[in-house]
Amino acid sequence: MRLNDLHPAEGSRPEGKRVGRGIGSGLGKTGGRGHKGQKSRSGGSVKPGFEGGQMPLQRRVPKFGFTSKLAMGTAEVRLAELAKVEGDVIDLASLKAANIVRRDMKRAKIVLQGEIDRAVTVRGVALTKGAREAVEKAGGKVEE
């Protein structure tokens, strides 16, 4: 057996449609497109969502919600990431210095994900209830 001998099993792959090759083929003349109309023309198709001139669903339904500007400037920091910070005081500047928080972030919030194994002082950074308990359990303290 060689690569040039390989071929699919007989009847497993359908023959391609040969359109416009006489009435005997069943796809002659109009080529399976019917008579006239937009969809019979070349390049003729209605765009997705078009409902024939009726106001489309996506424009009938009201817009809702918004993106909070506060959330866009707040970074989420996992508890386990605090191990990368050198020193025992954790504030926004030290988080930025350790490349945990992007430089353009104005606020940070520490969430309970992972563990902390050393005592740290958290200053000027928000914490979730669980993260606050974990920091205090490890012997650290939180200063607002």
UniProtKB/Swiss-Prot annotation:
Region (Disordered): 1-58
Disulfide topology: none
GO terms classed as biological process: translation
Keyword Manganese appears in the UniProt entry: no
Keywords in alphabetical order: Ribonucleoprotein, Ribosomal protein, RNA-binding, rRNA-binding
Any single GO CC term annotated in Swiss-Prot or TrEMBL for this entry: cytosolic large ribosomal subunit
Family: Belongs to the universal ribosomal protein uL15 family.
UniProt subunit comment: Part of the 50S ribosomal subunit.
Name of the protein: Large ribosomal subunit protein uL15
Biological source species: Alcanivorax borkumensis (strain ATCC 700651 / DSM 11573 / NCIMB 13689 / SK2)
